[in-house]
Amino acid sequence: MVNSTTESSALPSVSGPKGSKPTISAPVGNPPVALTTTDIYVGSGKEAVETSTLEVHYTLMAWSTGVLVESSWDSGQTATFPLSGVIAGWQQGIPGMKEGGRRLLIIPPDLGYGAQGAGGAIGPNETLIFVVDLISVL
């Protein structure tokens, strides 16, 4: 289930212009229990579908700590991958997004890295905060 939302006091805010690294505020309170998506900018290009290969910039924050874990913007290199090869939260939360768009994804643990976590700043049962800029649908 995907909850699309436009605003919630518990969700982090995202700021910054298109084409640059977003700034994400620290989350407040308990995370949503379902996948939540919010379009920060709606793109006008080609639409991503479940079978798409994508070129994106992304920023990842851990909900429990509010710590920025990683960002492709820091290296200046986009990430390219088939949507079918990433975590379920992306597989469910990215389709429908269009090139040029920026989307906030709040991904519960069962659609992320689950009870095992991913090591480092992504511990067990971590809710993930992603801001995804869809550069290209390949």
Regions found by a protein language model. Name each.
Residues 1-138:
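Cross-family detector of peptidyl-prolyl cis-trans isomerase
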